């Protein structure tokens, strides 16, 4: 019989590295192996525990309450604040929207006002819960415009959203003005600090200029903050914090309408593994406030160094002014951003391409963590080489006939055969019979084709791609 752990390690060889500070999306590396060891041991110790019933596993309840308490101190939360440990930022956002909707049962057509830069999880919440997402354009600095946000609010608005920071550009919205406008109309204001909530408080302590964004701002009613990002905890935890218990009440669920146990949940999940909770608690206990200050200092030092590298390279510029640890770069017409992405990836630096949106050109996203600091000189060299290679390769051009064909398509009317043809033409094949992912070695042409498609067509193509990826692999008889 084969060793499953040996096969597991072989499978993992195809994944992006989670350590080494070179994967600048999806993972957040502290650069400290001891933090990883503590997390692994805590997760393993609680892998079989179930946070479904806090009276059955009171240790998990204690850990959750202590995590929320640590976050409350970071977020300037009042003594009345309460919080919930969720499975990730998307669930925190889903619950914030669900709670806002259900707190206003008299509103039959609920709406929420979002900056165009708000995280896509709010669109998911709108889809799940039947809340209309009212998108408001941002200014040239990529921050929400408070006056335009205020004008979009009406009697059916149940939630107003601001980002701290926005994922795509790394800037903090003017929370003070937005929250004041929401409060004046009696509307909840949620600050999405999923990616900034555990690092921005230390930015202020380090003397960096950060717009006000915490519960210290009057009118902010709830905040989401992910612990698996800049708390450097294991994947699978986030926090949703409310200013007071009354604001959380609509989020809680109970059902005694069946013959089994009375279901009682504070999240969308019932069964919740104790592993991520214990892993997160152990990491936060180990690092502590002073440790997080040191890690934040390293992350911001890496940000400053990377920004300097980008600004030094002809043809590159930083998009917006980073308030946090997210850096967005764009290119001029002398080189193609998608080719530049491929070149960086080929040199061991995973960066995330962002497609054009509205008037904004394609860009490249970097989530910088403390573990990146030790490698910034390597990044500088890789960036210089990648820029030269991308410039020499020239732009990736999508045939005009293909562009016209894509623009004429209605994604709602396409059949599975149509999608198969489009996916094959784009290079997004999917998975083979043995479940292996099949993608081209370089993604520039794929991204260029997606870039000329409308957002609706991108969504349809990528959902078709995901459907073809997730197909069962059967064992031979």
Predicted stretch roles:
Residues 80, 87-254, 261-266:
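Conserved PLP-enzyme active-site core in the AAT-like
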Residues 1-61, 65-69, 330-477:
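Non-catalytic terminal extensions of PLP-dependent enzymes
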Residues 205, 209-325, 329-334, 477:
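Active-site C-terminal subdomain of aminotransferase-like
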Residues 64-72, 94-101, 123, 176-179, ...:
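Predominant activation on well-ordered alpha-helical scaffold segments within soluble catalytic domains
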Residues 126, 182, 310-311, 344:
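A generic structural signal for well-ordered alpha-helical segments
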Residues 81, 314-317, 350-355:
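A short linear hydrophobic-aromatic micro-motif
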Residues 56-60, 83-90, 114-116, 320, ...:
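Active-site nucleophile and cofactor-binding loops and adjacent substrate-binding regions
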Residues 79-80, 320-326, 357-363:
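Short Gly/Ser/Thr- and Asp/Glu-enriched loop/turn motifs at secondary-structure junctions
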């Amino acid at each position: 019989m084969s060793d499953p752990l040996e096969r597991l390690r072989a499978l993992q060889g195809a994944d992006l590295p989670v350590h080494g500070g070179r994967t600048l999306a999806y993972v957040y590396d502290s650069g400290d192996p001891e933090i990883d060891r503590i997390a692994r041991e805590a997760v393993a110790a609680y892998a079989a525990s179930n946070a479904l019933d806090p009276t059955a596993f009171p240790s998990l309840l204690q850990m959750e309450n202590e995590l929320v308490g640590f976050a409350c101190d970071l977020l300037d939360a009042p003594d009345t604040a309460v919080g919930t440990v969720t499975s990730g930022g998307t669930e925190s956002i889903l619950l914030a929207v669900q709670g806002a909707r259900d707190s206003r049962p008299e509103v039959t057509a609920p709406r929420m006002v979002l900056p165009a830069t708000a995280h896509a999880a709010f669109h998911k919440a709108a889809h799940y819960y039947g809340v209309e997402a009212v998108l408001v354009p941002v200014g040239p600095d990529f921050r929400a415009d408070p006056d335009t946000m205020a004008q979009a609010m009406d009697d059916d608005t149940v939630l107003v959203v601001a980002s701290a920071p926005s994922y795509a550009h790394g800037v903090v919205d003017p929370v003070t003005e937005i929250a004041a406008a929401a409060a004046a109309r009696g509307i909840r204001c949620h600050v999405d600090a999923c990616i900034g909530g555990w690092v921005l408080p230390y930015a202020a302590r380090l003397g960096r200029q950060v717009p006000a964004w915490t519960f210290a701002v009057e009118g902010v009613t709830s905040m989401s903050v992910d612990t698996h990002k800049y708390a450097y905890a294991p994947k699978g935890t986030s926090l949703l914090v409310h200013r007071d218990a009354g604001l959380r009440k609509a989020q809680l669920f109970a059902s005694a309408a069946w013959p089994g146990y009375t279901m009682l949940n504070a999240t969308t999940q019932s069964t919740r593994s104790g592993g991520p909770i214990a892993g997160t608690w152990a990491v936060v206990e180990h690092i502590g406030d002073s440790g997080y200050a040191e890690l934040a200092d390293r992350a911001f030092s890496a940000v400053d160094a990377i920004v300097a590298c980008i600004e030094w390279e002809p043809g590159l510029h930083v998009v917006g002014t980073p308030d946090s640890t997210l850096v967005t770069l764009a290119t001029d017409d002398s080189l193609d951003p998608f080719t530049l992405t491929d070149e960086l990836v080929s040199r061991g630096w995973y960066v995330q391409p962002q497609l054009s949106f509205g008037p904004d050109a394609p860009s490249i996203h970097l989530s910088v963590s403390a573990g990146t600091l030790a490698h910034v000189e390597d990044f500088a060299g890789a960036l210089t080489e990648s820029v030269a290679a991308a410039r020499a390769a020239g732009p990736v051009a999508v045939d005009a006939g293909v562009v016209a064909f894509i623009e004429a398509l209605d994604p709602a009317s396409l059949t599975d055969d149509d999608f198969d043809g489009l996916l094959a033409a784009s290079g997004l094949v999917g998975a083979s019979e043995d479940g292996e992912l099949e993608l081209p070695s370089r993604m520039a042409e794929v991204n260029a084709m997606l870039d000329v498609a409308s957002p609706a067509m991108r969504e349809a193509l990528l959902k078709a791609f995901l459907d073809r990826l997730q197909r069962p692999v059967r064992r031979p008889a």
